[in-house]
Amino acid sequence: MVKNNFTPEIKKLCNDLLTAFFQMNQDCDNIAYALDSYLECPKASSIYHLKFAHIWPSDTFADHWSEVLVNEGIIPHRGSQVGNNEEYANIVDVFEDNYRNIANLKESVLNAIENLDYEKGCKVLVLELEEFARILSGLVHQSDIWRNKAKSYLNDGKVYKFDIDFEKFTVI
């Protein structure tokens, strides 16, 4: 671990992102549970959970980011998660929520890049966040596909077919 003299604001910003990655995992787990338990989309739930929910705490995001923070001399602190007991009315509500969550997370990463880009000694942090933004762009696109497919299948009265076809329009 290197000893950098990051300001408390930079440390907070970095740890807020770490917390956001874990929050995203929790939110995605809740979506997977809703798909599986009462929205009757067990196949979609399994695929979504394995291909989307699992990336947030992994070495793609949270674990990787915490390692970067340690290497840069910032002690990682995972903040509290916000609970969500919401029950979704249908698959459209699920994937609207998912899209909103991922778009907001990408915006947070882009804002962090903008803030850190002007700070000395933050080059490594910025480069890592730029890679996150690149990955997030693909995930936003995937979320938009799911959202549009959910609308189409629900409007056609074919939620059962959405579950069957989910893997076909999952490109991640």
What do these predicted ranges mean?
Residues 1-172:
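Iron-associated oxidoreductase/ferritin-like identity signal
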